[in-house]
Amino acid sequence: MEAFMVSFERQKDAKFCMYRENIPNFESTLSSITKSTNSIKILLEDISNVQKVITDPCEQSCSSCSPNVLNKFLGIEEKLVNNVEIPDSVPQKSTRPCLDDEKEGSSVVQPPESGNRHVQLISEQEFKSIPKYQLGRLTLDNLNEIVGKMDEFLTKKNAILGKTNKQITRQDREVLDNWRELEIKAKGRLPTTLFFIENDIRPLLTERLRLSFAKAIPCLRHIRRVREERCGPLTFYYA
């Protein structure tokens, strides 16, 4: 055993000599490493002491510990808040909730139903302004149904016109070609590309309203829902 210890000391001295020769500032580096090791050792001892304190059972029940002692043990700094104003009386809720809700509801402005429609629906007041000889047997619901189909077609057309070349399908391409042919026939008289002809709307209507489409156009022109432009045999309509 003594021979082993002697050989171990010799090997250690030989290694230290080699380190001193090859490592610059070996003594200062070794001293800093030693200090760091000692600091780590002290830190580990503190951690073990804290763990021992935590694991040890408290001599008294937790309910007997005061908040100050508990905060001090946990390392929590306690800040006192002064000059806190407490209201003398709490505002009471009205005993008439139904009336209050009605007042609040009356002050809320409801948004219009029209939104971003291309052709707005007809109001009852506008419907009454249409001459009786133009209306015939057409009702407000009939006209609004026709107006809804016009808006549906223009919305779809606007969506197709807004597509990029990559988004356009083969069917969309055929529809666009037909619209361009109609634009050529219009000879530049239309102020917008969102137009339609009678054949665009008729397939969207019911059989009964298809017969009334020609009679509904003068009514819609009267209240300025649609405008028309005649170019040869074709009549173009736009909002």
Swiss-Prot record:
GO MF annotations, alphabetized: microtubule binding
Annotated InterPro entries: SKA1, SKA1_MBD_sf
Which cellular component, as a GO term, is one annotated location?
spindle microtubule
Give GO BP annotations, semicolon-separated. Answer: attachment of mitotic spindle microtubules to kinetochore; cell division; chromosome segregation; mitotic cell cycle; mitotic metaphase chromosome alignment; regulation of microtubule polymerization or depolymerization
Organism whose genome encodes this protein: Caenorhabditis briggsae
Job description of the protein: Component of the SKA complex, a microtubule plus end-binding complex of the outer kinetochore that stabilizes spindle microtubule-kinetochore attachments, promotes alignment of chromosomes at the mitotic spindle equator (chromosome congression) and assists suppression of the spindle assembly checkpoint. Kinetochores, consisting of a centromere-associated inner segment and a microtubule-contacting outer segment, play a crucial role in chromosome segregation by mediating the physical connection between centromeric DNA and spindle microtubules.
Annotated signal peptide: none
Give the principal location in a single coarse category.
cytoplasm
Record gene name: ska-1
- Subunit: Component of the SKA complex, composed of two copies of ska-1 and a single copy of ska-3. The core complex associates with microtubules and may form dimeric assemblies. Interacts with ska-3 and microtubules.
* Keywords from the named record: Cell cycle, Cell division, Centromere, Chromosome, Cytoplasm, Cytoskeleton, Kinetochore, Microtubule, Mitosis
- Name the record gives this protein: SKA complex subunit 1
According to the UniProt record, where is the region Disordered? Answer: 87-115
**Pfam families attached to this UniProt entry:** SKA1
